[in-house]
Amino acid sequence: MDSVNNSSLPPSYTTTGRTYGHCLQMLTCLEPPCTATNGNGISNNRCLKCIVVTMCSIFSIAAHLAITLSCITLIQFIDQKIIYINCTIYAITGFLIAFIVRLTIKSSEVLTSIGKPAQFIFALISSIADTLITRNMLIDSNPSYVKILRAIEMTSLMCFVMLGAFIASYHYVCLATSGDLTWKAGFLILTAGTIIGISAPYGNISSLFGFLFLYTILAINVVRDASKALMNTCYYRICRATTLRHPSRLGCGRMSSTQDVNATHEEAISSADTIDGQIPMVVMSHATGVLIPVVIALQRYMTKKTVSLTSTDMLQGVCGVLVGASVSIFIPSRRDESLSRPIIILLSIIGAMAITLAGFGLVLGPTLFSACAAALSCYTCINIRNANKGIKQLAAAYVVKSILGFIITSLLVCILVALS
């Protein structure tokens, strides 16, 4: 088989940026030529343009995730009635389902292209309904009108969250099939976006600033496809060519580099086949993720008689995930069996210490435990990615995506803990 240096790059996705306008082209760095490729070959030059596009895409994906999560957190602030708490539970459940369900790449692309403008419309509908209620702009203050507007607002928010969850899920699959450095940077930045999205509604943000930020981010995501921009970079395409040993777009890879119709398609690989030998690590990652709100609830219960737990205390525990993600960046990308047992033992000891501290009512306990859970999840994802190269990379990306989904869902459940 020919070396990757003698093969062409995978075909790029259609660059929709050419239709945006000159200013947006310059802003998204689509015009400068790629310096890492010469024709169909691969040079050893570093491509600054593709580095900038990659980082812009990751930040755009993180901002979109933050907006989606902030809407879930925002539901509880509409009203403290039980129906809104139930809606929060439904939204969290729907978000988790979106990160567990495996859709084909084609279906995800269609859903993303339709869902992004639909999100913008649903956000507009919900904001108009909320403005009419809060600003007393109704001509007739009949309570039935208010109930109808609230129902419209909640329906729009739920649709917004579900569409955003599926879009974010697809974005993370694209990140999980990229190179190690890109994936680690994405894991850290998306974790930061998660924390910002969950904590933003707790801040004293003016409605005008919130609306401007919301619609700016949504407009950017409607106009510019961050996932396609990421997959069009030379780093992503070279990674695909190196991994599969032949040029291929995401979702179109085959076991053989020929056009044999009987060759195994990468979307035909089951995700269950990618966790052989990794099942204990996957179970531990999901278990520690689920235990994050439990540890926070334990710390809340132990301090309830003396000190009331504020939203700030709850967010301090959640922010430990960002600390754990930052530490996990330094974990070696190459799988080393000699490091697995010491890392697992160390994280288990730290987790036990964190639970003990939470039992004594210290805020450091939940913070330390959530950091431990994030580090363990990242380490598990690294092992799964390293154990499944080539044709199995896409199937492994869905497993990695589900681990991230459990972590985010656990942080969202912490909202309900604060309400209890």
UniProtKB/Swiss-Prot annotation:
Keywords: Host membrane, Membrane, Transmembrane, Transmembrane helix. Coiled coil: none annotated. This is Membrane protein UL43 homolog. It is a multi-pass membrane protein. It comes from Gallid herpesvirus 2 (strain Chicken/Md5/ATCC VR-987). The gene is MDV056. InterPro entries: Herpes_UL43. It holds the Pfam family Herpes_UL43. It is found in: Host membrane. Belongs to the alphaherpesvirinae HHV-1 UL43 family. The chain crosses the membrane at residues 58-78, 81-101, 114-134, 157-177, 181-201, 203-223, 278-298, 312-332, 343-363, 364-384, 399-419. One of its GO terms (cellular component) is viral tegument.
